[in-house]
Amino acid sequence: MAEKRKYEPLKIEKKWQEIWDKNEEFEPKDDLSLPKKYILSMFPYPSGRIHMGHVRNYSIGDALARSYRKSGYNVLHPIGFDSFGMPAENAAIKHKIHPKIWTYENIDYMKKELASLGFSFSKKRILATSDPLYTKWEQSFFIKMFEKGLVYRKNAIVNWCEYDQTVLANEQVEDGKCWRCGNDVVQKELPGYYFNITKYASELLDDLKLLEGKWPNQVITMQENWIGRSYGLEFKFSLDEASKETLGGKFDGFEVFTTRPDTIYGVSYTALAPEHPIVKALLESDKFDENKKAKIKAILNQSPRERQASDKDGEFLGIYVVHPLTNEKIPVWVANFILADYGSGAIMAVPAHDQRDFEFASKFNLPIKPVVKPLEGESEGSKAYSEYGVAINSELINGLSSEDAKSFIIEKFEKDGLGKRITNYKLRDWGISRQRYWGAPIPVVHCKCCGVVPEKEENLPIALPEDVEITGEGNPLDKHPTWKFTKCPKCGKDAIRETDTMDTFVESSWYFARFASDEKTWEQKALDEKSVNYWMNVDQYIGGIEHAILHLLYARFFQKVLRDLGYLRDDEPFENLLTQGMVLKDGKKMSKSKGNVVDPDDIINRYGADTARLFILFAAPPQKELEWNDSAVEGAFRFLNRLWEKSQTIKKIDKLPEIDHESLNKDEKFARLKIYEALKKSTEVFGDTFAFNTLIAACMEALNAINAQDNDDVNAEGFFIILNLLEPIVPHIANELSEELFGRKNFTKIAVKEEVFVKDSIALAVTVNGKKRAEFEVTASENESEILKQAKQNVAKWLEGKEILKEIYIKGKLVNFVIKG
């Protein structure tokens, strides 16, 4: 008897990883007539080590990619590295190492880690966004967007992180803090470059309908709220004559936007953001005493988070506007709750019908005039009534519903030339300027003669100088002795190169299209039209929900821009989106600071990659949080050992055996039932639910059922199918056992055999005088007299000594005995 082989995961995993690499089994085929699937997991930042969140993300994507390959699809499953960014500079300061060296050493290490898990990535299309070629084409996109008016430069109040010494986009500020370092964000006026994402606001919002049922509702809702479309009236409050004089004739009024023009008669004050030009002019004048100036400057210096957390506060500015309908004088205040970048940074305040306005008016004893009556009952005086109702105390619209009153006021203002109906968005243009070294240089120069001039395409890429000192103070590019000095591409005179680099979210906004472009064309063009339009859009995208209004919104914007520039065809980049849950330990997100990190390398070295993958996909549905459990990891390892041991009892075959199902005994039939139930389950899991935990459970049940009988053909058939189903999940052991037993001929699409689901017997209920007393199994071949005989035996104690008045048999359902007494 041959000696049993021991399951040695590290040995077989290394073997199969080498075979896959040698045979280039995971490279997409050049035949673009084949049906395709593009499976993409969000690429990692090269921090130096992969973590369990990465393992989960890439295990999900890999299972799908492998499944589609078996089903005959041409599959693109790429990986790369989002390799620009501030952590590299922070590491340079801490470890005295150049950001480029730190980044690429980390990439090399992470490539090995990812390979050790057996992920079926295309190795020919691996990219890093800090590669010069990637920078070249990104800079080319920037220039084309600049020429189309989709990029512009302006001075603006920006979100500034003192710790990272850089500008942040609105989306990168979370509760007033920097999304990356967690420190407070302050407001600062700086020149910078902006992507005109608001030009696409309507399309970005409307096209979310295309994603319904394909993206999580939560992500769609978050983007809807972030884009924030609202309809209303924009009009101008004119300053009274005395106020114009106070401001030296520089201003005659200011624009406001309101979504509730039906409440215009309830305006008791107006309020400006602290950054408003009128406030700035007054601060620079001699009209304010020092105490008032100090208070306003204190508000200006507060971070958005501090302003939001503070009580409503402000100052009367000593000026008035004229109400456009009543000609009343309305006081103008500066208020800490007004956002400079929403609308015009000014509001009409209606304290009776807006809670923020109410709180401010209550604090400063300003009038509160109700102009909307609730449809039922009365409004409370202790808070604002913000719902719709009927107009009151409003001369021209009394008695009208809020909807009709809105329409009336808008029409009147438009007719009289006082204002206009507009659509407004909360979404702001994307500020991309960053005062950091390790990013893609913005490809423009500043010329005294020509102004801001984009670089010539033939000069790209504008590469970073490598002889820099990273100290954390200021911008290394600005301080470099030679790099920024250049010639103007337009006139040839001396010019200064732009020293800001692009926000790293720019890189991740188009990488999916670069992956879809044939790598043989990467030198010659940004995107190869033929291959990109074959592969795009991404069939399944996988990543964390934390990217809902950052990366996912920017990527949708870039897709539309590249479509309009003629590079892409589709309106949306990602057909389907799966947002996987976090991996927790002890109920908390894994982090070094909490001391609860599990190193994937440790798990692989102890149990093998297949055990890590099996546990990750079995422990919870992908959309749910996953709690790390050491004993469950042990359980996954034991299952693979049982699979290995069972394989040594299986006969070798190269196709499914022909089995006469009717000739099998009960246990053999049950085993086949469980085998094909698992096969059916796989269609549902890989095609729809991604509930890999249910498929793994079905395979475990099937293995148990196989072990409970000893038919060689059923064993072989079952193992043939189980290895097929498990291959996307635990590919190393599945390939090893399949090669040994089936020559890997079972890794193809297998048809379900419906005969195994035909029931040989049915359960009949037995009732006595309509009350259920028993249940028993009968075969389809048994006749009525045999069934009645068995039924009597099953309820004998209830029939004993009784007269049976009637015997009723309802075929396939029940037997009822009607007895006397």
Swiss-Prot record:
Residues reported to bind ATP: 592
Keyword tags: Aminoacyl-tRNA synthetase, ATP-binding, Cytoplasm, Ligase, Nucleotide-binding, Protein biosynthesis
Motif ('HIGH' region): 44-54
GO molecular function, one term: ATP binding
Top enzyme category: ligase
PANTHER family cross-referenced by the UniProt entry: LEUCINE--TRNA LIGASE, MITOCHONDRIAL (PTHR43740:SF2), LEUCYL-TRNA SYNTHETASE (PTHR43740)
Family statement drawn from the similarity comment of this UniProt entry: Belongs to the class-I aminoacyl-tRNA synthetase family.
Name of the molecule in the record: Leucine--tRNA ligase
Gene: leuS
